[in-house]
C-alpha cells in the first residue's frame, strides 16, 4: 500500500509499504529516498511518536495515511527516572518528547501502565500533554516516579482533640460520602460534622476534586454542639481556639474566656472580625457575630516600638507605634508631627503602597523598619496619551485609577468608545481591571493608544479530530481571548487548550498580530490531557 510522509518543510514523500513493515523499515525507505539517517528521524502519527520495533499495523496506519517526519538534533539526550524503591532507570529522550511519550518508554522498560505513573520534577507533577522542554528538563535531569494506587487515595482528618483519622477515598467522593466514612470509623453523626480544608467549610454536595483535595491532604473536623453557640478564634500562629459563647457576651467577656484558655491578658488582645477591630464594651450580636464565626486574635506587644518614615526631601521622622496600628493611625501620627493631611500621604514599604485599613503587622513591619513617604499632589497627576495619528492627549489621573477609568476619560475627551481602545505602556497591553500603579505608570508617563478596527476578521481553528471552527477576532486579541472564544463555542476550558500556528505554540499574553496571524489563517488546537491525581 502507499503512505505519505510529510516533512516540516511541507514536502510530501510517497512510500510503498506493507502493514507488517516496522517503523525501522519505514525509516530505511525514507533514508533511501531522502538520505536522512534513521537515527535522526522521528515519525509522528495521530500525535504519537512511533517506536522502531512496532509495525504500521500496530499503530493502525492504513493506506494513504500521512505520517509526520520531525528531525532529531543529533544525539538526543539521556534522563534518569528514580522510583520510590530507589531504582534508577535511564531513558533516551528528545527535549520535544511529551510526558506521555516518556511514560510509554517507562512502560516498555518496566511494564508499569502509564495511567499508574506520576512523574515529578522540581517538586511539580508533570502533565501528559506537555513536553520535556516545557518543564526545562535537560540532559541528565532526574525525574521521580510515584505510583498511583489503583482505586483511590488516602486522606487524613484531624479532630480538635488532635486525633488524626485516615480514610480511603476517591477524588469523586462527595463530602457527604466522606462524612459517612467518618461516622463508620468514629460514630459521629454527619449532621454534627463540619469539615474544613484550606480555611473553607466543605459543602455536602461537592466532591473532593471540586476542592482540589489530593492524596494525603488533611481535612479538619469541627463538631457542631447542639444548642448554645460556638465561635472560633484564630491566632497569628495559625492555632484555632474554640469558645462557648452567647450572642449577648461582650468583647470583654470573650477576651476573658481567651485568657482562661490561653493565658493571654486581655489588654494584650486585639480581636478582629470582618476586617474591623472589636471594642470591649460592645456585644457579639452588635457585630452580627453568629455561631461558627471566626475572629482573628492579634497580640499587642507591650510598650510598642519605633519606626522611621523617610520623606522625599531626605528628612527622617521617628514614630512610636504598635504592630497593631493601622496605616490610617500612622498617617494621623505623621500629621501630628508634620502637619501633612493623611489624604496627601502615600506610604511605601518593601516597594508596596500601604492600604489604610491594614495594620503594620499585616505588612510585617517591625521595630526600626523604614517607611517611605510620598506626597500625592492634590488632584492626582498628569499622564499623556499618544494616538497613532501623533496627537497627544493630557489626562488628570490618580495612581489608583483603573485602566477602565482611563479609557472612560479618553472617551470623555475624544469620543472613542472604550471597547475600541487598546492602551500600551512599556510594550505591554494594559488590562482593564488593573490600576496605573500596578503598571508603575507615574506622573508624565506616556501611554500609546491603538484603535481596534470594528469588524475584525475571521480565522479558523482546526482540531485533531479534523473539525474546523470559525472565529470572529481582532488582530489585537490576545491568545487568551481566542481560547475564551473557543470555550464559548466548544466548551473546552482554556487551560486544556494548546494553540499552534506555523509550528509554534502560542503564548496567552501575546496578540494575534504579534504572531502575524492574518484573516483566514488556520490555527491548530491540541488538547492537554488533565494531570489528575
Swiss-Prot record:
Domain Ubiquitin-like: start-end pairs: 1-76, 77-152, 153-228, 229-304, 305-380, 381-456, 457-532
One MF annotation (Gene Ontology) recorded for this entry: protein tag activity
Marked site: Essential for function: 68
Cellular component aspect of the GO annotation: cytoplasm; mitochondrial outer membrane; nucleus
ADP-ribosylglycine carried by residues: 76
Single Gene Ontology BP annotation: modification-dependent protein catabolic process
Residues with site note (Interacts with activating enzyme): 54, 72
Residue span(s) of the pro-peptide: 533
Crosslink position(s): Glycyl lysine isopeptide (Gly-Lys) (interchain with K-? in acceptor proteins): 76
Presence of keyword Oxidoreductase: no
Cross-link (Glycyl lysine isopeptide (Lys-Gly) (interchain with G-Cter in ubiquitin)): 6, 11, 27, 29, 33, 48, 63
Keywords: ADP-ribosylation, Cytoplasm, Isopeptide bond, Membrane, Mitochondrion, Mitochondrion outer membrane, Nucleus, Phosphoprotein, Repeat, Ubl conjugation
Short name of one Pfam family: ubiquitin
Cysteine disulfide partners in this protein: none
PROSITE patterns given in the database record: UBIQUITIN_1 (PS00299), UBIQUITIN_2 (PS50053)
Residues found modified as Phosphoserine: 65
Matching PANTHER family: UBIQUITIN
Similarity comment: family membership: Belongs to the ubiquitin family.
Additional observations: Ubiquitin is encoded by 4 different genes. UBA52 and RPS27A genes code for a single copy of ubiquitin fused to the ribosomal proteins eL40 and eS31, respectively. UBB and UBC genes code for a polyubiquitin precursor with exact head to tail repeats, the number of repeats differ between species and strains. For the sake of clarity sequence features are annotated only for the first chain, and are not repeated for each of the following chains.
Name assigned to this protein: Polyubiquitin-C
Organism field: Sus scrofa
Gene that encodes the chain: UBC
Amino acid at each position: 500500500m502507499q503512505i505519505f510522509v510529510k516533512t516540516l518543510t511541507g514536502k510530501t514523500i510517497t512510500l510503498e509499504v506493507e502493514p507488517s513493515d516496522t517503523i525501522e523499515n519505514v525509516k530505511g525507505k525514507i533514508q533511501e529516498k531522502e538520505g536522512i539517517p534513521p537515527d535522526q528521524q522521528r515519525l509522528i502519527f495521530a500525535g504519537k511518536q512511533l517506536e522502531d520495533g512496532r509495525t504500521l499495523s500496530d499503530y493502525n496506519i492504513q493506506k494513504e495515511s500521512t505520517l509526520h517526519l520531525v528531525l532529531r538534533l543529533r544525539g538526543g539526550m539521556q534522563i534518569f527516572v528514580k522510583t520510590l524503591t530507589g531504582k534508577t532507570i535511564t531513558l533516551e529522550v528528545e527535549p520535544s518528547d511529551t510526558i506521555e511519550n516518556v511514560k510509554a518508554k517507562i512502560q516498555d522498560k518496566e511494564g508499569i501502565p502509564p495511567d499508574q505513573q506520576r512523574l515529578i520534577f522540581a517538586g511539580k507533577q508533570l502533565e501528559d500533554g506537555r513536553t520535556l522542554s516545557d518543564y526545562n528538563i535537560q540532559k541528565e535531569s532526574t525525574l521521580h516516579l510515584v505510583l498511583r494506587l489503583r482505586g483511590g487515595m488516602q486522606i487524613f482528618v484531624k479532630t480538635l482533640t488532635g486525633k488524626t483519622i485516615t480514610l480511603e477515598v476517591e477524588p469523586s467522593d462527595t463530602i457527604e460520602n466522606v462524612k459517612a466514612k467518618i461516622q463508620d470509623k468514629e460514630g459521629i453523626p454527619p449532621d454534627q460534622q463540619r469539615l474544613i480544608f484550606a480555611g473553607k467549610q466543605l459543602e455536602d454536595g461537592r466532591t473532593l476534586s471540586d476542592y482540589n483535595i489530593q492524596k494525603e491532604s488533611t481535612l479538619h473536623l469541627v463538631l457542631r454542639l447542639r444548642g448554645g453557640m460556638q465561635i472560633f478564634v484564630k491566632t497569628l500562629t495559625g492555632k484555632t481556639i474554640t469558645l462557648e459563647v452567647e450572642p449577648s457576651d461582650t468583647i470583654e467577656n470573650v477576651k476573658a474566656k481567651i485568657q482562661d484558655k490561653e493565658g493571654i491578658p486581655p489588654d494584650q488582645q486585639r480581636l478582629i472580625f470582618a476586617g474591623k477591630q472589636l471594642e470591649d464594651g460592645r456585644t457579639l450580636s452588635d457585630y452580627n457575630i453568629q455561631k461558627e464565626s471566626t475572629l482573628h486574635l492579634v497580640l499587642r506587644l507591650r510598650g510598642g516600638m519605633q519606626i522611621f518614615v523617610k520623606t522625599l526631601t531626605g528628612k527622617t521622622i521617628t514614630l512610636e507605634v504598635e504592630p497593631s496600628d493601622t496605616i490610617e493611625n500612622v498617617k494621623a501620627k505623621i500629621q501630628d508631627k508634620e502637619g501633612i493631611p493623611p489624604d496627601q500621604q502615600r506610604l511605601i514599604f518593601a516597594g508596596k503602597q500601604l492600604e489604610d485599613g491594614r495594620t503594620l503587622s499585616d505588612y510585617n513591619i517591625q521595630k526600626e523598619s523604614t517607611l517611605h513617604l510620598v506626597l500625592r499632589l492634590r488632584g492626582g497627576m498628569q499622564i499623556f496619551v499618544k494616538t497613532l495619528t501623533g496627537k497627544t492627549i493630557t489626562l488628570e489621573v490618580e495612581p489608583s485609577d483603573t485602566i477602565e477609568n482611563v479609557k472612560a476619560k479618553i472617551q470623555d475627551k475624544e469620543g472613542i468608545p472604550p471597547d475600541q481602545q487598546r492602551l500600551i505602556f512599556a510594550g505591554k497591553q494594559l488590562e482593564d481591571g488593573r490600576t496605573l500603579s500596578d503598571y508603575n505608570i507615574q506622573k508624565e508617563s506616556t501611554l500609546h493608544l491603538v484603535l481596534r478596527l470594528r469588524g475584525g476578521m475571521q480565522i479558523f481553528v482546526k482540531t485533531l479530530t479534523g473539525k474546523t471552527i470559525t472565529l470572529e477576532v481582532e488582530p489585537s486579541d490576545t491568545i487568551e481571548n481566542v481560547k475564551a472564544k473557543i470555550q464559548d463555542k466548544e466548551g473546552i476550558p482554556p487551560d486544556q487548550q494548546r494553540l499552534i500556528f506555523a509550528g509554534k505554540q502560542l503564548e496567552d499574553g501575546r496578540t494575534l498580530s504579534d504572531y502575524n496571524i492574518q484573516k483566514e489563517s488556520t490555527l491548530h488546537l491540541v488538547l492537554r490531557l488533565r494531570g489528575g491525581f
